[in-house]
Curated annotation (Swiss-Prot):
Superkingdom of the organism of origin: Eukaryota
Classification via Gene3D superfamilies: HPT domain
Domain HPt: 30-125
Bias (Low complexity): 125-147
Originating species: Candida albicans (strain SC5314 / ATCC MYA-2876)
Gene for this chain: YPD1
Protein's name in the database: Phosphorelay intermediate protein YPD1
Molecular-function GO terms, alphabetical: histidine phosphotransfer kinase activity; protein histidine kinase binding; transferase activity, transferring phosphorus-containing groups
Protein task: Phosphorelay intermediate protein that is part of the bifurcated SLN1-YPD1-SKN7/SSK1 two-component regulatory system, which controls activity of the HOG1 pathway and gene expression in response to oxidative stress and probably to changes in the osmolarity of the extracellular environment. Catalyzes the phosphoryl group transfer from the membrane-bound histidine kinase SLN1 to two distinct response regulators SSK1 and SKN7.
Similarity comment: Belongs to the YPD1 family.
Compartmental location: Cytoplasm; Nucleus
């Protein structure tokens, strides 16, 4: 393993190096061991993301929580913190626990269709680069079409889970590319 690849993976911020390096040391006893663990994880993630998509359509919060818990543990065992953190959100939101006080900014429903990631805007403290706003200001020019469900609504929790899932997928894609480079 080249030092450059090792350093690049460490610098990526995608991996808790203390955890991942323990797994890599097992390659000394069995060549390719860590890579095989990553390959199994990739398969698990792909299957579980499909299950999560199904449970989102069904609005099955219990199964969503269980799937989030499963992936959280698998990701954490490999030191894949970005994925693990988002899966922890899925797990907690499935139990209707907003442990990180995540706020929905706005949900616009399309007719009778279920809330989906395409029509959810969330406020996670980021500012709009176009106008510098953080999305909390109200405009006198637009009508208030806000349809933000409260925490008693399953749609609220589904929207939070969809946000966490989108971020978990992004973290997975980034981690997969970084690990593919590492193992080349």
């Amino acid at each position: 393993m080249s030092e450059d690849k090792l350093q690049k993976l460490q610098d990526s911020g995608l991996v808790d190096w203390a955890v991942f390096s323990e797994i890599v040391t097992m390659d000394e006893d069995e060549e390719g061991f860590s890579k095989s663990l990553v390959e199994v994880f990739v398969s698990q993630v792909e299957e579980t993301f499909e299950e999560i998509d199904k449970y989102l359509k069904e609005k099955n919060l219990e199964k969503l929580s269980s799937s989030g818990h499963f992936l959280k543990g698998s990701a954490a065992a490999l030191g894949l913190t970005k994925i693990s953190n988002q899966c922890e959100r899925i797990q907690n939101y499935g139990h209707k626990i907003n442990f990180d006080n995540f706020q929905l900014e706005d949900i616009k429903t399309k007719g009778d269709s279920a809330v989906s990631a395409e029509n959810v805007a969330v406020n996670d403290g980021e500012t709009n680069p176009e106008n510098g706003s953080n999305g909390n200001e109200t405009s006198n020019n637009k009508t208030n079409t806000s349809n933000i469900p409260d925490e008693s609504s399953d749609d609220f929790w589904i929207a939070l889970i969809e946000d966490a899932l989108a971020k978990a997928r992004d973290g997975f894609d980034q981690s997969r590319r970084a690990l593919d480079e590492y193992y080349e």
